[in-house]
Amino acid sequence: MKSLNIKLIGLGLLAAVGFSSCSDDFLREKQNFDQADPAIYNDYTGCLGRLSDCYALCLPNPGGGPNWQYPSYGASDDLSKCTEEYAGFGIFVNPLEELNTVSGIKEQPDYFQGADALNIRNNVWGLIRNINDAIIGIEGGTLSREEKDELVGQLYILRAWRYFLIWKWYGGVPIIKDCPPIEAESVTPRSTAKEVYEFMIDDLNTAATMLEPSTGAGQWRTGNNYARFSMATALALKNRIMAWWCSPLFNRSGDEARIQACYTAMKADLEKINAAGYGLYKPEGKGNTIKDWANMFNLMGAEDVEGLMIARFNTIQEGGVPDYSRNNPWEQKIRPKNTLGGGGITPSATLMGIFPMRDGGVNAAGAHFYSKLKQSSVEYDETVPFLHRDARFYRTYGFPGIQWTHSGTAMSEGTNNNPYEGGKYELWNYVWYLDPALVGDHTSSAVYGADNLLSSVHGLYLTKRSTGDKYLYNYVGAESGGQGFRYSYQSYMEIRYAELLLNLAEVAAGAGQLEEAVGYVKQIRQRAGYQETCTEAGYEYENFGLTEAASTDYGTCLAQILYERQIELAFEGKRFDDMRRWLLFDGGANFSSISGAPATWTLIGWGGNTCDFIGYKPFNGERRENIEWQVRPTIEEGVGGKDWAVGQWDNMPDPIAKHVFANGALDKSSGEIVAWTKDQTWAEFKSWRSGFVVELNARSLVNNPGNADKNTYADLERLATFYNTYLQAKMKRGDGLNADKTVDGMYITFLPRYYMLGFNQNTQTKNPKLLQTIGWEDYNGGQGTFDPLAE
């Protein structure tokens, strides 16, 4: 059996700042010990400190990842840039940089070892050892059985979580349940993917049993224990792992017995999770509004019925001794520069196009990828792509003309920077050029944005998981240092109830329960505002906008489920995992091309090609583009200025302002151009333009606007008249250029061996007895021989 050398030193303690039930005095006394005194395991507070230490090192963190410690969380990282979500080649799809240990242009990333093999707090196996040490210590202490179960149950979930993060990449990894001697000769065999799967499921079943008495009725959903791992957390993580185990990445034969067993277990677990008070967040008496869908990410305590695996944060500023700061950086990342945000994140135009239309069907952009889904009868216009879309579109993307308020103000006395008070902030990110010759250049980045965004502008912004008008941060304006949204305490949901339903839908479909599987998707759609039947003229649909064939054809059912995952879980760090699990880069048709691959790696289930089976166009060979809305060439040639001199509000670089002052402005009511009779000032220009703004924070947006008291769809139609008069959509080159812009026409290239990752050279050097995975080179350049899928 293959072996592993693990070299580790040290133990330490750190406060888990998200849990106020921990004693600050105790934590201050116990910090920075290299070894935990066994006596602490006879004291509940001491044991809680050990548990909190494990939480602090293992909880998901939107400020990190994807790396050995954290998964992707939805930003434009190396994994998300391998999907439809972002342009720019991520590490696994770059056609110019083939990955391999020795002969590759670039070495594969390390998700197995970690930053420092000799520091228990900075590597994978140190974190696992830390958890094992706490389990052994607490079980050997003098606490009551009830107290031990509450603490150890949480540790079992943490251990399963750590194993899941390496298992999903490497399949077969060492299983370590104790704390072996720390010495060079300490060797642990590498187990198979099946053995690791069974180990994780056993840990989670044990955790669920331990935690059911104290959390099975939802007791920890409120108070100081909110966000601690519970029975529901254990079952939710088990649900995710089972979905992976049933998918073709690990189930090449399409083993029906495996799928049926997982389906039975997952369905029983769902009943327990429901009984604990969890479900899709739908406020009683409010209908299904997209504002509520967006606010789902901002809830805490009893209101939060959606979050099943949660990381909490605070607004404490860093630098304290000890440092208890734990800030969620997401809001800072996604906000534009003229709010004192980090500048924003730019999603691709590709996924924007794939989003459903208002009748639930796909437009031409979506049909390019999904051939089995219902085609929309609603017109799609790339110039105004926000018209007639699935309601979730409007709380995922930020485009010119939306109101995106925040607390505080970024304005500074005597400057033109950041010209809005937070409660009135409007995103106007249309762009212009300095040179008319660049207006049609799809590769030029020499653009300037409105409202002093200037060269910091993005054509499209990501707004998903913004706190919106909940303001879960301590805003720091320019007068106080300008840190903006840095100190945010918004929680982060790694697993939420919607994913739970979609995981079960996948497996139910595989077990032949197509109607049941579609029923779970309908729940997601209904929460997003769809109805069983919509009769509004021009937007008629049945069946919540789903294709009827999903209830009778397995491939179509899977396509509908995976499509709903792509939309509902967009920009939450899940898409690359889904594409790997379902082999969507090439359908899994090329495993035989991997050097040394056994016959058992050949995909037999799903017709031997998952892409053909579900009607999805393989992602290999595709490109992603970006989008911007530029001032039309008929408006001052699409050309404006590059700066806005301090104190000169009336000397704006915006060509639209110059144009309307001289030629008249669009009237929001009549749609006609009328003479400009007001003062030619920034204040008057802003007031006029604000008449076209869509107030998404203040309005209820549903997919049947006939029932909405405030019709945001009508507001969007009015905004479209502004676009059609002053702006035009321009596709900007996303993929396809190298650093010196001499290579054109590059396309997504994901190699078959990337589905099951191999170890990089640094990992193998530190573990010379660790044999490489089939398809990857060892550190001597030889071919790997370890088969993680062997049983």
Identify the residue ranges that each predicted region occupies.
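Long, intrinsically disordered, low-complexity segments
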Residues: 22-23, 124-125, 199-201, 225, ...
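Short coil/turn linking the two alpha-helices of tandem helical-hairpin repeats
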Residues: 167-168, 172-174, 215, 244-253, ...
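Conserved, well-structured interaction surfaces
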Residues: 43-52, 56-67, 90-170, 185-198, ...
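An aromatic- and glycine-enriched ligand-binding surface/loop that stacks and positions planar moieties
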Residues: 23-94, 205, 232, 240-442, ...
